Structures are given as C-alpha cells and as structure tokens.
Amino acid sequence: MKGLPALLLLLIGCVSSFGSQDVPLRVLAEKLNIHIGFAAGNNFWSLPDAEKYMEVAKREFNILTPGNQMKWDTIHPERNRYNFEPAEKHVEFALKNDMIVHGHTLVWHNQLPGWLTGQEWSKEELLNILEDHVKTVVSHFRGRVKIWDVVNEAVSDSGTYRESIWYRTIGPEYIEKALIWAKEADPDAILIYNDYNIEEINAKSNFVYNMIKNLREKGVPIDGIGFQMHIDYRGINYESFKKNLERFAELGLQIYITEMDRGFPLGGSVGYYLKKQAEVYRRIFEICLDNPAVRAIQFWGFTDKYSWVPGFFKGYGKALIFDENYNPKPCYFAIRELMEEKLKER
C-alpha cells in the first residue's frame, strides 16, 4: 500500500511528537473541503490535563460533537425542565475555535431519563413529549448547531425497527415526525440518521437504505446519513464499504462518518497492531476522500487516554489517533500523509 515505507519508519518508535513544522489535520481537511473532528468528553474543561486536551483539539479539528451532553438524560432531566448548560460549554468551545457543531442526539433508545421510562404513555402523550423535546432543543441551538443526529440507532442488527419506547408506543412514524419537527425548528440545519454496523452492505444497511429512500420519496426532510464506524480490529470489507457509500450518495444524501474508532487486543504485538490500525484508517479515509458526498469524518474522541473502548470491550484499546500522552500515533501520520497526497492530486 502506498505510503507504508514511511509508516514503518514511524513505527520504530511507535509514536512521534508533533513538531511546529507539521501541518494539523484540520488545515489539510479544509483545503480538501471536508471536516475532520471528534466527540468531546464530559466536562473536558475540568480534566486534570484539560489544557493539553483543548490545545490538541483546537489545533487538529474543525468539527465537534458533544458526546453525551445533548442526550435526553442530561439535557431534559425532568419533564418540564431542560438543562442546556453542559451542552452550551461544548458549543461555546467549538464556535470560539472555528469548529462547526454536530448535535448528538435528539431521538435515541438509550440514556433516557427515569421520568420518561418509568411509566406508560399513550401514543398521543409520547408524541407530544417528543415534539416538545425536538423543537425545544433544536430551537435553543438554532444557527449554532449545524448538523443534527435527529434519530440514532433506530434499526436492529437483523434489519428491523428496534423495539424502543418510541417504536412500541408510536410506531415507525416517530422517525418521520422527528425529522419534520427538527426542520421546523431550524430550517437551515442538516438533518441526518445515524447508526452503527451499516458501513458494509448487509441486512441492516439494506433496511436503513430503504427506510431513508422511502422517507425522501415522501418529501421528509432528511439530508444525510451517519456511519458511526466503531470498527472491528480486523478491519472491514473495503469494496463493500465503497459501494455502500456510493448507493447512499445516489439518494442525494450527504455522508458523515460520525463516531469512528478502531481498537485492538492489548495482549498482542503492539507494533503489529499499530501498523494494521494505520493501514485500516488510511484505507477508510482514502475511500471517503474519493467520494464527494462525504462531508465529515469524526472520531469518538481523539486520545486513547479517554477512549470508551477499554471500558466496554475488556482487553481491547488504543483505538484513537493520539496515545495516552497526546502523542500522534502511526495512524495519525498515515491519515495526514494521505491527505497531503490527495491535495497534490488536485
């Protein structure tokens, strides 16, 4: 693969420091007319190493997703009370540092407050609650949040609607209604559907494709598709991924890579896995940069120090592009090298 000799040299020391002569990813991304970003951790401004965290974030990225601060349990903790303060801090940091904000998420089956899940609702009651939530949150951030994950993970791995509180009580039309309400609250926002395990052509991505196709044929305002891309350490079928992006693009959708990471087993050869990780990230970026429908590529975090992977997948980790000490990893350099090559081709 093109670029691997340089990559192998980088692997000799496993990591390298970022030098003043090096071009940050966001600068290259802007020249390529794409956004590159990350999901910001909870209260990152209060971390013991907050200064370093923010220094790297604003240097490298031009799009930010609040990881948890816009989810129901945080932003709507009581039926008649909204708490915007945690999310506001993320938005303020992003806008101050010339990043756009990707809102996450308006409708999901997880991280719901007890007042919502602790009792039964009629269809009409739940529709009213959902409408109030979507319109209130989107209106609050109107003009400041450019992209919204309106509906998140509404489809099961088997390719059917997920049996969530929304689907059981309202039916599949909750997806359509949430999109319509979001567009009413901010006509200029980019509205997307976001999900995992849909990067390749499979039963789940087929269902999502047909669902979105039907929504667009009905005139429902859906602008894009979000591929989370929490990638298995063995990688993905690149040809299937490429064709999948192409068919969603043919629907007229903008494409967003929203939550990417790629961990690996911690008990094996670190050098080998770092090399494979760099190869996988480079190939994914190459496919994305070759598709003009892809508007942003975001990681679920950026430093291994605060990655979610070790806490959820025992024995796995090192999923992101900076190590625990904020040193750029081989995958960082592989991505940067590819972006530089793409610029030379233009």
Curated annotation (Swiss-Prot):
EC code: 3.2.1.8
Keyword set includes Kinase: no
Pfam families: Glyco_hydro_10
GO molecular function: endo-1,4-beta-xylanase activity
InterPro entries the record matches: GH10, GH10_dom, Glycoside_hydrolase_SF
Active site: residue positions: 153, 259
Major enzyme class: hydrolase
Keyword Repressor (UniProt): no
One GO term of the biological process aspect: xylan catabolic process
UniProt KW keywords: Carbohydrate metabolism, Glycosidase, Hydrolase, Polysaccharide degradation, Signal, Xylan degradation
Signal peptide per UniProt: 1-19
Catalysed conversion reaction: Endohydrolysis of (1->4)-beta-D-xylosidic linkages in xylans
Domain GH10: 41-338
Family from the record: Belongs to the glycosyl hydrolase 10 (cellulase F) family.
Name of protein: Endo-1,4-beta-xylanase B
